[in-house]
Amino acid sequence: MSACVPTVSSPLPLQDPMSKLWRRGSTSGAMEAPEPGETLELSLAGAHGHGVHKKKHKKHKKKHKKKHHQEEEAGPTLQTPAKPQLKLKIKLGGQVLGTKSVPTFTVIPEGPRSPSPLMVVDNEEEPMEGVPLEQYRAWLDEDSNLSPSPLRDLPGDLEGQEEEEEQRWLDALEKGELDDNGDLKKEINERLLTARQRALLQKARSQPSPTLPLPVGGGCPAPALTEEMLLKREERARKRRLQAARRAEEHKNQTIERLTKTAAPSGRGGRGAARGERRGGRAAAPAPAPMVRYCSGAQGSTLSFPPGVPTPTAVAQRPAPSGPAPRCSVPGCPHPRRYACSRTGQALCSLQCYRINLQLRLGGPEGPGSPLLAT
């Protein structure tokens, strides 16, 4: 960043005879001494900005001396006429980059505006004078031996580039060289590709296109169509139209039926009324077929027939058994018979009587001292 360089200007009346020598030396490139009435600028800043605060204090002290000195020597300075000459200096970090003396300049008669950052403005109480930006650029180009600023030619260059790009796009469109998105194909930089990608790219470029040209004049000729073939073709087309119309009609009927079924419960009578209407409208369910029931129980077995159905054969009724119910065959057991022994066929009532029966009838392992017999 450029540091603010404080300058001290002090009017110095030069009546010394050495001033003539200074004027002569200016023609040979030496330092030019200021004329009477001009200001001498002294740069008080280092290359790195060291000692800036000290110089400010000295400037503050010299300011009072300068005012006092101006009051004393106001008379002789006003007597000498000053030449209308403007000296511009470009300072950056305390170093003077260029100096240009302009004998004539143009003052811009416009309204108040913010000063350009390219203008050199001193901190002293001097009148502000504006210089046109074009003239200032010309001075900079002369001092730095640079070419004129290319900013004026930018709009024209952009228009030319757009026209060239549009022309290249139209040419690629005619040749069919656009990509899938309709843009120009970008050139592939092989330096950015890997070795494998470079090899695949070269292989694709070396191989011919797999597309084959279509035969123009060769091939078998199309067979001639007779009247019979034309009639068959028309018949097949008519059948296809009829089938398509039939399918459309069936689909339409199915859609209407489905809509009426879904819209029926939302009628005026509600779901119950719609359900009752559907029940009333349907045919009565067929009566159940006559059924024969057979029941077997402790009191006996029964066979039931529906009313109006005759029995196939007359059933002979058995006489009821007379006498008391049979009892257990084991001597001394008062319990009634519950089942028969699988080996002897005797009536038994429990497992204990079963073992006693085996011992008595078949001579089993149970002896006379068996606990079963004792119980």
UniProtKB/Swiss-Prot annotation:
Alphabetically ordered keywords of this record: Coiled coil, DNA damage, DNA recombination, DNA repair, Metal-binding, Nucleus, Phosphoprotein, Transcription, Transcription regulation, Zinc, Zinc-finger
UniProt signal peptide: none
Chain ranges of zinc fingers (HIT-type): 324-355
GO CC field: Ino80 complex; nucleolus
Basic residues compositional bias, start-end: 50-68
Isomerase recorded as keyword: no
Molecular function in Gene Ontology: zinc ion binding
Main location: nucleus
Coiled coil stretches, renumbered: 230-262
Pfam families listed in its UniProt record: PAPA-1, zf-HIT
Annotated region described as Disordered, given as residue ranges: 1-84, 143-165, 201-220, 262-287, 312-331
Protein role: Proposed core component of the chromatin remodeling INO80 complex which is involved in transcriptional regulation, DNA replication and probably DNA repair.
Listed name of the protein: INO80 complex subunit B
